[in-house]
């Protein structure tokens, strides 16, 4: 491990709070320094992860003692055990993708904003395929499934230690820490921009839509999001059953993002409705694919809710209900102009 473990949660709380504050300051200062920081951390993470994965793949293919060879069963859906395992895995995939589409939320702050954010979100899917499949192939066979299960909370660090010893394990630990820090920064930036967009239409309090004259960022919204994140981190680390809490958070967040992407796909179909019948490629791109994603994600949500514990169901229902209440408040109490805007549609031309 990179740091010595402690029986007290307070050292972890202190370190986590400091890291969140650092990423919050970077997010407030500006999008350029945020992007450069994210790129620097990402490059280190990917070099380590891909390098160790290739190392593990060569190690497994070399048939070293204790390794488990790659088989076709690794890539077969028939190898998924247990009722609901497929939908649970897909839900985790949705959770893992959330945050990789952050470029969409900063579309007003990037060059060529009509095309670059969307392309980056699609490009992220290709990156994810490499980042998740390659480690699965390269690291799963390094040691026995029983040992991987016994070290499930730090599997990447354990496998790296098997391959190269404690020194390389610490390098992997640093990469994982940077991954968490980068995700924290992404969450602050994306959430603050979402809040800014909603506040600018008076769906949320106007204070969240204020832009700092000095930094040209939604500073107040970023600070509020950062404080909420700190409070959530404290609650999580002080929980008596951290493992269960983490599992519940992943599942509930995955369900909420699945619902979010369903609504996004529906909005895309409505916005591009004039292009659906213009030509075959447009029909596939802005009609068939979004509709297929709606059906697919709806199936994932239904299957996941059927097998979810009551606590997770109530959490999802409660959050959605709270969102509906806030929507009605914005519509009928705050008189948000958003609900009075004309329905927009893209020009009837070739999709860029």
Predicted regions and their residues:
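Helix-loop-helix junctions that connect adjacent transmembrane segments
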Residues: 4-11, 40-173
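C-terminal membrane-solvent junction of multi-pass transporters and transport-like membrane proteins
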Residues: 8-11, 37, 208-216, 258-309
């Amino acid at each position: 491990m990179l740091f010595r473990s402690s029986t007290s949660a307070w050292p972890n709380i202190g370190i986590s709070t400091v890291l969140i504050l650092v990423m919050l300051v970077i997010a407030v200062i500006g999008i350029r320094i945020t992007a450069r920081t994210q790129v620097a951390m990402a490059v280190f993470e990917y070099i380590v992860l891909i390098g160790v994965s290739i190392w593990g793949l060569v190690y497994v293919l070399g048939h070293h003692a204790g390794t488990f060879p790659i088989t076709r069963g690794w890539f077969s859906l028939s190898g998924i055990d247990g009722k609901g395992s497929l939908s649970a895995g897909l839900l985790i995939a949705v959770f893992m993708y959330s945050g990789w589409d952050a470029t969409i939320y900063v579309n007003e702050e990037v060059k060529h904003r009509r095309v670059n954010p969307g392309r980056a979100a699609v490009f992220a899917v290709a990156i994810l395929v490499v980042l998740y499949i390659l480690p699965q192939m390269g690291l799963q066979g390094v040691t026995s499934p029983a040992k991987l299960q016994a070290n499930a909370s730090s599997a990447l660090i354990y496998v790296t230690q098997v391959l190269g010893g404690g020194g390389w394990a610490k390098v992997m630990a640093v990469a994982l820490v940077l991954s968490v820090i980068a995700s924290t920064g992404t969450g602050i930036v994306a959430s603050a921009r979402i809040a800014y967009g909603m506040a600018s239409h008076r769906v949320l309090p106007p204070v969240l839509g204020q832009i700092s004259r000095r930094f040209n960022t939604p500073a107040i919204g970023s600070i509020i999001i950062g404080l909420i994140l700190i409070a959530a981190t404290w609650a999580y680390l002080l929980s008596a059953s951290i493992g269960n809490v983490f599992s519940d958070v992943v599942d509930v967040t995955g369900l909420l993002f699945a619902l979010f992407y369903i609504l996004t796909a529906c909005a895309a179909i409505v916005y591009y409705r004039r292009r659906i019948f213009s030509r075959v490629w447009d029909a596939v791109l802005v009609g068939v694919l979004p509709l297929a994603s709606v059906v697919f994600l709806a199936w994932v949500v239904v299957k996941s809710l059927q097998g979810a514990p009551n606590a997770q169901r109530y959490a999802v229902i409660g959050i959605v209900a709270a969102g509906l209440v806030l929507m009605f408040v914005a519509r009928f109490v705050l008189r948000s102009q958003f609900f009075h805007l004309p329905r927009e549609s893209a020009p009837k031309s070739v999709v860029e």
